[in-house]
Amino acid sequence: MKKTILASTLGLAALGAHAQSSVTLYGIVDTGIGYQSSSAALGSNSGGHAVVKMVQGVWAGSRFGLKGAEDLGGGTRAIFQLEEGFNSANGAQSTTNLMFSRAAYVGLANQQYGTLTMGRQYAPYYSLLAPYSPTNWLTGAYGAHPGDLDSLDTIYRINNAVVYTSPNISGFTVSGMYALGGVAGSTNAGSSWSVAANYIRGPVGLAVGFERLNNSTSGGGAWGANSTANSNGEPGVSGITNGFQTAQAQQRFAVTGGYAFNSQWDISASWSNVQYVAGAGSKFFDTQIWNTGGVVLHYKPLTALDLAAGYSYTRATRANGITSAASYRQFNLSQYYTLSKRTGLYFVEAYQRAGGQTLGTNGAGNIIDATADIGDGQNSAPSSSRSQVAGAIGIIHRF
């Protein structure tokens, strides 16, 4: 049961008014044991070894938070959320130097006019597409598309963001965001923007979204600390994108959808186009593009048991001197057993096979064989070879 503290009704005798407030403490603890057939340093094509280790946040990121609302009257509420992630294996904060790395925002919500929030939060690109992302359909963090390249598992949040989300109108919801870079002399440097829409009606759901993240380092280069899409480094760094860390901008476009056949079977699918745009200061010279398609099938044979299987295929374009474009095929399985309303056991398994070539850490001129990197890049390390097998067993508790 969530621990909800309802503030007593505030008697404002002088004004003759009453207001009701609520604050909720909530969290998730997710810890397990994981295996990788090859674990290597980012950018390395050698020295990878098998490893068995404690893992955390595989099914859902460990976190604690506070969220609340105050009734302002007339159907309007003031809302806020403060949320921090942590490593449940050792107690460390998930992001150094940030007290609330997962969310920190305040805003106003009205059932008729929608919601406006300001602060550190998700982009609409993720918020509205998430219901049909591969990791929300029971494949865990290992089910993210390679390196979470398309950010449908959202490995970052946006600072300084203003987000408007419409009310649900006949199944449709739209949302837009702009995040101010705050860089003197340039409104574009470090800024981010995103738009998205979804439609959910009965067993059918569809969503489409776009986002662009600008580097605060003019012309590209090391991802600037003032970039709104920043949390101790460039967003989205993995074995897939390592050679393109100096991009002037990142942009993503994706379409997701799902259909529930009945109470036991449902399916989701997604397609994304990701572009890392080169600038004068980048270590690569052509815009690098990746296209990814994926599908997840979910089956619930018992009330307490959920099974899922997923497949995705990612292919890069030939650019930056590469003649054999990188490709990644990933297969996923997952099993989740519900012990109670708040507690469950999970098992996840994945296999990925890479092909072609990509850029190494030094960018253009450092062409290397593409190596496998399963999942979102936070819960595993890249392989030093073309293939990688990974799996985990864990327990998750929500409060």
Residue ranges of predicted features:
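Gram-negative outer-membrane beta-barrel proteins
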Residues: 33-41, 86-92, 124-128, 182-186, ...
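Detector for outer-membrane/organellar transmembrane beta-barrel domains
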Residues: 196-338, 349-351, 388
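Gram-negative bacterial Sec-dependent N-terminal signal peptides
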Residues: 1-20
